[in-house]
A protein has these predicted regions:
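Walker A/P-loop NTP-binding motif
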Residues: 129-141, 152-173, 196-201, 245
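Short coil/turn segments at secondary-structure boundaries
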Residues: 118, 129, 156-157, 194-196, ...
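Intrinsically disordered, low-complexity accessory regions that flank the conserved helicase/ATPase core
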Residues: 1-105
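Conserved P-loop NTPase nucleotide-binding/switch module
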Residues: 263
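Conserved pre-motif I regulatory segment
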Residues: 93-144, 154, 161
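The conserved Walker
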Residues: 145-149
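Conserved nucleic-acid-binding Ia/Ib motif block in the N-terminal RecA-like helicase ATPase lobe
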Residues: 111, 171-249, 257-260
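Short amphipathic alpha-helices and their capping/turn residues within compact interaction modules
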Residues: 108, 113, 117, 121-122, ...
């Protein structure tokens, strides 16, 4: 008995089913690839290829000599939260350092505090109240604040004091450093940050602390102009991405001893 040929309606229905199955498999494959890529990207965060290859994971902050005053350490977390609400500070993360509302209790040298006062800075801003203790403690952080909120001081002051401490322990020589790198999106911002650090470093030296040398790495600035800094070792490098890459390729600057990284803006 001859078999009846499927109708056009049935053929269309079968075709739609096959296309639906094909699309489902394709979507599943795309989703699987997306998850693999996301997992790989997450794993690469703040880690180099050598660290990933050796499965090195960092679970502890860099040890620093700075400690908050005893009365700050003895505050309860509830008291810390009350202070954060008072100054409109929002914090996320595990066991954040306590907020400190003045530079003196942060143990900032008097000479630096006096220098800040000459610049019209009498007290820390909200991001500095939380961000400075965080950086002083050796913790990683992402700081968000409005323009003019004091972000530059939040990342530059801890690096300056860490550098002075390192120089006082073992004086830097030619080829040493930097121990801190600040990457800025523009030459103008990099120069402003560099000038701010340089002024604070001079006030710190006048106060009897070790000399801290900063290097400005931007287009238009010849390295021959800063050769004296390179000869004595560099504590802090302030750079734009393009110039930094060029100096790394030419081995003018090495990052083997860099333990402090800031990506500005």
């Amino acid at each position: 008995k001859p078999t009846q040929a499927p109708s056009l309606v049935q053929e269309a229905r079968d075709l739609r089913e096959r296309l639906r199955d094909t699309e489902s498999r394709a979507d599943a494959r795309v989703e699987e690839e997306r998850q693999i890529l996301e997992a790989h990207t997450t794993r690469k965060k703040l880690a180099g290829y050598a660290e990933i290859a050796q499965n090195i994971q960092y679970t502890e902050p860099i040890l620093r000599s700075w400690r908050p005053p005893h009365f700050v350490r003895s505050r309860t977390e509830e008291q810390n939260e009350i202070m954060r609400k008072r100054y409109h500070v929002s914090v996320e993360g595990q066991d954040p350092p306590p907020l400190i509302s003045n530079f003196r209790d942060m143990k900032v040298p008097v000479c630096v505090i006096e220098h800040l006062r000459t610049k019209g800075i009498q007290a820390p801003t909200p991001i500095q109240m939380q961000g400075l203790p965080t950086a002083f403690s050796g913790r990683d952080m992402i700081g968000i604040a409005f323009t003019g909120g004091g972000k530059t001081l939040t990342f530059s002051l801890p690096l300056l004091l860490f550098s002075a401490e390192a120089e006082s322990r073992v004086p830097f020589q030619h080829g040493d450093g930097p121990i801190g790198l600040i990457v800025c999106p523009s030459r103008e911002l990099a120069r402003q940050t560099y000038e701010s650090i340089k002024a604070m470093a001079e006030s710190l030296e006048l106060g009897g602390y070790a000399r801290v040398r900063a290097l400005l790495c931007i287009g238009g600035v010849s390295m021959s102009e800063q050769s004296h800094i390179l000869r004595h070792g560099v504590h802090i490098a302030v750079a734009t991405p393009g110039r930094l890459q060029d100096m790394l390729e030419k081995k003018i600057v090495q990052l083997h001893s860099c333990t402090y990284l800031c990506l500005d803006e």
